[in-house]
Structures are given as C-alpha cells and as structure tokens.
Amino acid sequence: MAATPIRVIVSALVILSVLLLSSSLGVATETEIERNETEVRLMYEQWLVENRKNYNGLGEKERRFKIFKDNLKFVDEHNSVPDRTFEVGLTRFADLTNEEFRAIYLRKKMERTKDSVKTERYLYKEGDVLPDEVDWRANGAVVSVKDQGNCGSCWAFSAVGAVEGINQITTGELISLSEQELVDCDRGFVNAGCDGGIMNYAFEFIMKNGGIETDQDYPYNANDLGLCNADKNNNTRVVTIDGYEDVPRDDEKSLKKAVAHQPVSVAIEASSQAFQLYKSGVMTGTCGISLDHGVVVVGYGSTSGEDYWIIRNSWGLNWGDSGYVKLQRNIDDPFGKCGIAMMPSYPTKSSFPSSFDLLSEI
C-alpha cells in the first residue's frame, strides 16, 4: 500500500527531529568536561596537600571527596559557559557543601543597628570629579591578606582593615593591627567574637578603648573564649582613631567618593556557591542583599567594559584572586551588587597629608 502524503510528511518530520536532537546532544557533549575517577582523585590529593587538609574522622576523607567532586562539577560547568566575566575554582572551601560553608564562615544577617554621626563628607554631588580607578594597595595603605579561620570574625577584619588604611594615609605608617583584641574585648550588645558583629561597634570600641594594639602584640588565634587579655589590652595603644562615619547608604557614587579617599568597611551577601568558589575576574553572578559578611573595599576600576570594586577578604590566599575579589560596580540597583552600598562606614582620623590626599580639592 502506498504511503499517503500525510504519512510521508510525518515520517520526514520525525526523522528531522531525531537528527536535530542528535545534533544538539552532540554539541552539548562536546562542551562537557569528562573526568574519570583517577583524574579527580589525583586532583583531590593535590588539593589536600595545597590546603594542608588532614581528616581524622573515620570515613571523613571519602565523604569530603564526594563533596569535592560535586564542587568540581560546578566549577567545570560554570567555566565552560562562554563569555563569563569571572571564573570559579577549587578554593580552600572545595570540600564543603554550601550549607557547611555558610554555617562556618557567614553569620546571621548583618544590620545597621548603630548609626554614626550624620555627615555629608563623602556625599556625591553633581560636579564632583573622581579618579577613574583607585587601588590603595598600590599606595601602601593595605596590609597583606589575613585569614579569619573557622571563626565568624569577619566584622573585626573589616573594621581593622579600614583602620589600618586610614592610619597609613594620615601617618605614613602601615601597621598590622589586632583583630583578636576586638574578638576578645569588644563584647557587648551586638559584637560577639566568633559569632559575628558589626563594624561600627568595633570602631566605637577602638575609640573608647583609647586605640588598638598591633597584631604582633595581640596576635590572632581564631578562638573565642570571651576572655579579654587584660595585660595586652592595657599596653600602650599603638593606633587611635578620632571617630567613624557612615557613607550615605544605597548610593554607589557616594561609596566611590569615599573609597577614593580611604579604604571603607562594607557588608555584603557572600552565601552563593559561586562566591564560595570564586577564583578571578569580575563577580557578576546572582546574589541578594541579606548581608552576612564584612569585608573592606580598597579600590575600584574597570576592565573590558565591566566596572568593579576591589575587595580584600579575610579568607586567606587560597580563596579568590590571592584573597581578593572584584565585585561588579554600577549596577541598576541602589543597594549595589550583593548589597555593598547598604551599610558602608569608615573610621576618621585627622592630619591628612595634602601630598597623599587623592582628592584634596573635593
């Protein structure tokens, strides 16, 4: 029996669909990264050495290996997409689930519970001329990247980083200061050592305490016993500040003006898997505004049409771009990327050397 025209057309469409599906599957397969178990195992062993990991629990190494494989899959899938502005990689957190990462290194939502003195010092005004790029590292105002360890003390590292910066700008001396003094001694209504805190309260403590010790005199140990070392705390304070102020909130232009003058403490949402495994480039991934991590902005710039903030983190050198992240700047949201413009603040200190002030005319 001869096939009807309709049957011929239907058969042709079915064959065409199969061919198209096979073609699309072939393309997808070509972009996938296939890794065998031996290769992944070797990568895992190398990662363990590089990150000085040693698991004691029975079966813990294998359990972590499974998590490592899941994170490696995420890394391969992310980096295989063309035109990404940033790359992810096997950071120091590659053996943690995202839930574990958030529980250990991030804390409850950070909220501005203590406002500073109202000021328009860095309020952006029409006509202000700001540098296209600023990097306080190049100006010698940023201490090398530190590591908060398994302690939720990001607030202390953020505040101390801003104080180290303004102290260098006003005195010419770059001194590494003590986060541990804040963790041990700044205990009050909000700040709670390894259980989180707010940068403005840290600035307040430094003021009332008459200054803050050096990291050498009061070294960091990532422990939270709630005991202030009175002997160390009573030493001569090395660095003081005059006060602290908030950058006008929800305004990236004002934040840019502030960062053009000094490093600034900010809070961001850092809970995504992409942030956990961030390696390099301009971070443009999805993130919200549930602020859970304190960092310090040490500059800004642009590359390939993408504006970014330069952020010094406190997760050591085996995360990000040697401890730094470039976070997308000038987005169509008043809160800024990951909420960066929601809670910025900075310490104040007099005697700005005119030769060092980048914007003496503003």
Curated annotation (Swiss-Prot):
Biological-process GO terms, alphabetical: proteolysis
CDD domains the UniProt entry points to: Peptidase_C1A
EC top class named in words: hydrolase
What are the positions of the active site? 154, 293, 313
Q: Which cysteines are joined by disulfide bonds?
A: 151-194, 185-228, 287-338
* Keyword Ubl conjugation among UniProt keywords: no
The keyword Isomerase appears for this protein:
no
Give glycosylation sites per the record: 36, 234
Q: Which InterPro entries match?
A: Papain-like_cys_pep_sf, Pept_asp_AS, Pept_cys_AS, Pept_his_AS, Peptidase_C1A, Peptidase_C1A_C, Peptidase_C1A_papain-like, Prot_inhib_I29
The signal peptide annotation in the UniProt record is: 1-28
* Propeptide residues, chain positions: 29-129
Q: Which GO terms describe its molecular function?
A: cysteine-type peptidase activity
Q: Which UniProt key words apply to this protein?
A: Disulfide bond, Glycoprotein, Hydrolase, Protease, Signal, Thiol protease, Zymogen
Q: Show the PANTHER family listed in the entry.
A: CYSTEINE PROTEASE FAMILY C1-RELATED
Q: Which family does it belong to?
A: Belongs to the peptidase C1 family.
Task: Briefly state the protein's biological role.
Answer: Probable thiol protease.
Q: What is this protein called?
A: Probable cysteine protease RDL2
Gene name in the database record: RDL2
